[in-house]
């Protein structure tokens, strides 16, 4: 069954300032890139071309900054038409047709069963799972890492939330989603 509500990701995120969010993407003003970019207005030069890719328009830095800030949660387009762009706006897109995934420390059991029972636990044993879980190849801290909830939202982002507090740890905008953020 479903237990009691532990936290509301949207409400926790809404309580944060837009500037304190860690939103990342991959963008390069000169084409293909493999390096992460912080999705902030101070990085407008690297983000502008990717945001308007294949649109046939060349936006100003001010237009791109407005969009970047809007995606981060600023009311830069005065959505409620009250002549104020300082209003708070909901920062989390609706989570629709996305299934969350919880990732935490490895918990898989192993067994050295002499019967070779073909269970998942035996498979882990013969493939060195125990050594992986506690060794350097798992980043040493693997066995004690915090539990994180990952979910996609209709704001174009993959969000990572701390499973205990609901705090957004970071969000990632896939490069192919950047041109769609204007819609």
Which residues does each PLM region occupy?
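A fold-level detector for beta-propeller and closely related beta-sheet-rich head/sensor domains
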Residues: 1-183
């Amino acid at each position: 069954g479903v237990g009691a509500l532990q936290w509301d990701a949207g409400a926790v995120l809404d309580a944060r300032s837009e500037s304190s969010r860690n939103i990342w993407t991959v963008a390069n003003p000169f084409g293909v890139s493999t390096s992460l970019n912080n999705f902030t207005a101070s990085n407008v030069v690297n983000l502008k071309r990717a945001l308007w890719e294949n649109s046939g328009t060349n936006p100003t830095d001010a237009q791109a900054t407005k969009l970047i800030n809007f995606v981060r949660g600023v009311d830069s387009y005065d959505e409620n038409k009250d002549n104020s762009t300082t209003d708070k706006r909901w920062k989390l897109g609706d989570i629709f047709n996305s299934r969350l995934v919880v990732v935490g420390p490895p918990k898989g059991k192993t067994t050295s069963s002499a019967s070779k029972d073909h269970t998942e636990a035996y498979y882990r044993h013969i493939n060195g799972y125990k050594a992986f879980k506690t060794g350097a190849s798992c980043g040493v801290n693997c066995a004690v890492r915090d539990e994180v909830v990952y979910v996609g939202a209709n704001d174009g982002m993959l969000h990572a939330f701390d499973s205990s507090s609901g705090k957004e740890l970071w969000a990632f905008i896939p490069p192919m989603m950047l041109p769609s953020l204007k819609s």
